[in-house]
Amino acid sequence: MSSRTGGRQAMSELKLRRLLEHNARLKDDLARPRVRVSEASASLIRYCKTTKDHLVPSVWGPVGKSEDPYGQTSGGKCCSVQ
């Protein structure tokens, strides 16, 4: 009979520990700083409008060879394996 009681107590302690860990995670989530969706979307739109993307020339216009970070280097001494 005492082994049953010990097993139940161990299960109860395990459940308590899990609940305490879950409670701690929930408290951490609650303490995390939040940003409103409207602020986040406005920030994303502002970033997209001000950051030039060289891979979308239809929006930003053609990119000069000297400005293109994805263009081929003029050194010509390196080989390219594809």
From Swiss-Prot:
Membrane-related topology note: Peripheral membrane protein
Single Gene Ontology MF annotation: G-protein beta-subunit binding
Cited SMART domains: G_gamma
Cellular component terms per the entry's GO annotation: heterotrimeric G-protein complex
Lipid attachment points (S-palmitoyl cysteine): C78
An annotated GO BP: G protein-coupled receptor signaling pathway
Superkingdom of the organism of origin: Eukaryota
InterPro entries cross-referenced by the UniProt entry: G-protein_gamma-like_dom (IPR015898), GGL_sf (IPR036284), Ste18_fungal (IPR041848)
UniProtKB keywords: Lipoprotein, Membrane, Methylation, Palmitate, Prenylation, Transducer
Keyword hit for Membrane: yes
Location relative to the cell: Membrane
Main location group: membrane
Annotated spans, Disordered: 61-82
Record's signal peptide: none
Propeptide boundaries: 80-82
Lipid moiety-binding residues (S-farnesyl cysteine): C79
Modification Cysteine methyl ester occurs at: C79
Family per record: Belongs to the G protein gamma family.
PANTHER family cross-referenced by the UniProt entry: GUANINE NUCLEOTIDE-BINDING PROTEIN SUBUNIT GAMMA (PTHR28189:SF1)
Assembly mode: G proteins are composed of 3 units, alpha, beta and gamma.
The protein's name in its UniProt record: Guanine nucleotide-binding protein subunit gamma
Name of the gene: gg1
